[in-house]
Design a protein with these regions (language model features):
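NAD(P)+-binding Rossmann beta1-loop-alpha1 motif at the extreme N-terminus of oxidoreductases
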Residues: 1-53
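Rossmann-like NAD(P)-binding element
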Residues: 53-89
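Rossmann-fold NAD(P)-binding glycine/threonine-rich loop
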Residues: 91-95
Length: 95
């Protein structure tokens, strides 16, 4: 199972850690505008490797975990990039 998380913060990171514990055969890909967050997530084993929006065509699941105002811009890009059987979760929070 190929899971992509866009926005590797508390919510997105927590979700993929749970997915990894329940489905250890999953491969977790991370997309984040903050390169240091992405590098830290890889070093900590939260995600397996970095990805780009173009890579979303391979996704089984996409978790969009960005602030709601950013999600409005990101979701159209995600929907244009994914396959017809990909499941997308939007889990942004309003603070």
């Amino acid at each position: 199972m190929k899971v992509f998380v866009i926005g590797i913060g508390l919510i997105g990171g927590s979700m993929v850690l749970d997915i990894k514990s329940l489905n250890p055969e999953s491969t977790i890909y991370g997309i984040d505008t903050n390169e240091s967050h992405l590098e830290e997530a890889i070093a900590l084993g939260v995600v397996d490797q970095a990805a780009t929006f173009e890579d979303l065509a391979q996704a089984d699941f996409v978790i969009v975990s960005v602030p709601v105002d950013i999600a409005l811009k990101v979701l159209p890009k995600v929907l244009d990039a994914i396959g017809e059987n990909t499941i997308v979760f939007e889990v942004g929070s309003t603070k």
